[in-house]
C-alpha cells in the first residue's frame, strides 16, 4: 500500500538548483512532507528477535519488560496436555506474554520445546511455595557446590546402624510369614478333622410330583372330572325343571265343604286330591232371625 501511494503522487520538479564544483543540490518546496514519509517508513520497520539456536549462540538474556523488576521468569518442563491457555491460567499471566518470552509466532511452537518459561510476579506464591518451578538462571551466574566429607568413624557407625536396622526389619518380615503359614496349616488341619468326625446328614425325601398336576393322584383327577361333568349338570337340570313347573309331585289339594264332609276330587291327568270340609258356625244375627220366625 505504501508503494502504491508513493506511485500515485505527481512528480514535482525542484524549485532551486544549486551547483557546486563537485555536485548539484536540488531544493524542493515541500521538504517537510518528505521527512514525514521517512518517519512513517521508519515506524513500519519490524524488529526481528533471535529464536532457538540464534538465541543460544548470542548468550544474551533479554528481560521480559524493560524496567520490570517485579517480574521473574520461571522455567518448567512441558507435559503432553499442556497448552498456552492452561499455562496462562495456572501462572496468572497473559498468553501474549508467554509467547513473547519464548519467541513464539504461533501456538503450535509450544510443542517443539521440552521446557517453557513463564513470567510471574516476584515474591509471589508461585516463586515461594511451588517446588516444581525453577528460577531461570542468567548465563553469567555460576553454581557453586559444597560437598562435606564425613569422618571415617562416623561413616562406619552410620553404615553399621543402617545394616542392623535392615537386618531387624527383614527378620521381622520372616517371622510374620512363618506365623501366617503356621496359622493357615492349623486351620486347614482343624477343618479336616471336624469334617471327618461329623456324620453326614441324610438327604430330605423328595415328594414325587409334576408341575402340571400339582401332586394330585390320578383317581382324584378322575373323581373331580366325573363330579364336574356328570353330577353337577344333573342337579342343575333337576333344579330348573322344578322351578319351571311350580308344583311338587304328590301334593294334596284341600277344599272347604259347608256340611263339614270330606270329599276326594279327581282331575283327569293328575293324582286324586282329598278335600276336607270345615264346619261353619252360625252367627248371632242368623240365630235371632230364626227364633223370630219360629215365634210367628
UniProtKB/Swiss-Prot annotation:
The keyword Transmembrane applies. GO terms for cellular component: membrane. It comes from the Eukaryota. Glycans are attached at residue 30. The keyword Glycoprotein applies. Keywords: Glycoprotein, Membrane, Transmembrane, Transmembrane helix. It is found in: Membrane. It comes from Pongo abelii. Residues 239-296 are cytoplasmic. InterPro entries: LYSM1-4, LysM_dom, LysM_dom_sf. The chain crosses the membrane at residues 218-238. Residues 74-118 form the LysM domain. Gene3D superfamilies: LysM domain. Residues 1-217 are extracellular. It is a single-pass membrane protein. CDD domains: LysM. This is LysM and putative peptidoglycan-binding domain-containing protein 4.
Amino acid at each position: 500500500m505504501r508503494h502504491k501511494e508513493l506511485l500515485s503522487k505527481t512528480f514535482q520538479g525542484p524549485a532551486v538548483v544549486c551547483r557546486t564544483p563537485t555536485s548539484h543540490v536540488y531544493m524542493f518546496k515541500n521538504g517537510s512532507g518528505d521527512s514525514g514519509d521517512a518517519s512513517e517508513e521508519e515506524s513500519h520497520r519490524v524488529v526481528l528477535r533471535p529464536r532457538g539456536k540464534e538465541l543460544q549462540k548470542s548468550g544474551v538474556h533479554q528481560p521480559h519488560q524493560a524496567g520490570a523488576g517485579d517480574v521473574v521468569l520461571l522455567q518448567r518442563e512441558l507435559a503432553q496436555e499442556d497448552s498456552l491457555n492452561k499455562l496462562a491460567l495456572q501462572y496468572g499471566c497473559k498468553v501474549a506474554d508467554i509467547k513473547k518470552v519464548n519467541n513464539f509466532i504461533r501456538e503450535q511452537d509450544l510443542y517443539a520445546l521440552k521446557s517453557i518459561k513463564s513470567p510471574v510476579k516476584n515474591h509471589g506464591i508461585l516463586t515461594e511455595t511451588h517446588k516444581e518451578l525453577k528460577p531461570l538462571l542468567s548465563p553469567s551466574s555460576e553454581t557453586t557446590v559444597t560437598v562435606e566429607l564425613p569422618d571415617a568413624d562416623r561413616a562406619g557407625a552410620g553404615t553399621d546402624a543402617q545394616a542392623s536396622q535392615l537386618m531387624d526389619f527383614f527378620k521381622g518380615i520372616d517371622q510374620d510369614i512363618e506365623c501366617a503359614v503356621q496359622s493357615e496349616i492349623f486351620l486347614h488341619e482343624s477343618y479336616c478333622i471336624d469334617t471327618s468326625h461329623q456324620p453326614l446328614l441324610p438327604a430330605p425325601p423328595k415328594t414325587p410330583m409334576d408341575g402340571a398336576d400339582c401332586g394330585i393322584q390320578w383317581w382324584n383327577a378322575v373323581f373331580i372330572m366325573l363330579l364336574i361333568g356328570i353330577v353337577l349338570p344333573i342337579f342343575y337340570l333337576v333344579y330348573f325343571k322344578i322351578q319351571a313347573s311350580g308344583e311338587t309331585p304328590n301334593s294334596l289339594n284341600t277344599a272347604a265343604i259347608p256340611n263339614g264332609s270330606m270329599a276326594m276330587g279327581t282331575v283327569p291327568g293328575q293324582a286324586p286330591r282329598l278335600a276336607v270340609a270345615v264346619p261353619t258356625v252360625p252367627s248371632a244375627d242368623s240365630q235371632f232371625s230364626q227364633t223370630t220366625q219360629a215365634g210367628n
